């Protein structure tokens, strides 16, 4: 029997002629970066599809987590899961915080909320769960624990584009949700990611962080990225 690769996932590709038409428009406009017309169209269509008003698209899902941590000004220990892609953990470390692992529920593979409080210390600043394989975390329990202990919540929703929980987008929970548009994800742009927040002030800060920290007047007011 000949060896045949079995792929976990494969990207869905648009017809080449459609991509070529979009590329032609980019060449004609000469706008290659920094929130061009196609980025704005993409953000609007994703927001409309998810019934959300705030989206900040970025280069990938990893930088989305970086920006979420930076936007919330987190310092100290972040409760997270050991069952995730390395980018979740490396983002915490790159932002100068310390990951503290809480074990998972063997049935859902998500963080077990009943084990969070035993890991809290005076240095804990946030909880960063992952919706593993698009299966929603126990968001109500996690958000309640965070509120009780005055912690922030970032959900890594890299697998969860389009997921609803009790009639609401899963991106509506926590302070910020991040996602990925990597080629292996449900919605792919080859590379890409986004941050979502219902908090308008956080949304504006995330927009500044995405563009080098510039505000609308082009004054640098935050330590941004690109």
What are these regions (language model features)?
Residues 44, 66, 140-143, 191:
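Active-site phosphate/pyrophosphate- and oxyanion-stabilizing loops and adjacent acidic/basic residues
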Residues 60, 104, 132, 183, ...:
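Short, conserved catalytic or interaction motifs in soluble domains
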Residues 1-31, 226:
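N-terminal "arm"/small-domain region of PLP-dependent enzymes with the aminotransferase-like
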């Amino acid at each position: 029997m000949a060896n045949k690769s079995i792929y976990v996932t494969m990207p869905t590709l648009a017809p080449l002629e459609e991509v070529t038409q979009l590329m032609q428009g980019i060449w004609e406009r000469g706008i290659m970066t920094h929130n061009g017309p196609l980025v704005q169209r993409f953000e609007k269509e994703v927001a409309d599809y998810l019934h959300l008003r705030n989206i900040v698209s970025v280069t990938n899902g990893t930088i989305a987590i970086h920006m979420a941590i930076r936007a919330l000004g987190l310092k100290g220990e972040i409760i997270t899961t050991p069952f995730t892609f390395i980018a979740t953990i490396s983002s915490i470390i790159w932002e100068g915080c310390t990951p503290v692992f809480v074990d998972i529920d063997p049935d859902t593979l998500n963080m077990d909320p009943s084990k969070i409080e035993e890991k809290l210390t005076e240095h804990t600043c946030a909880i960063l769960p992952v919706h593993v394989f698009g299966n929603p975390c126990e968001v109500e329990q996690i958000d309640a624990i965070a509120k009780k202990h005055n912690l922030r919540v970032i959900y890594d929703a890299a697998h969860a584009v389009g997921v609803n929980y009790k009639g609401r987008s899963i991106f509506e929970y926590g302070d910020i949700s991040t996602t990925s548009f990597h080629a292996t994800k449900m919605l792919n742009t080859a590379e890409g990611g986004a941050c979502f927040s219902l908090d308008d002030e956080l949304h504006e800060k995330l927009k500044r962080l995405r563009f080098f920290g510039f505000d609308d007047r082009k004054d640098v007011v935050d330590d941004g990225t690109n």
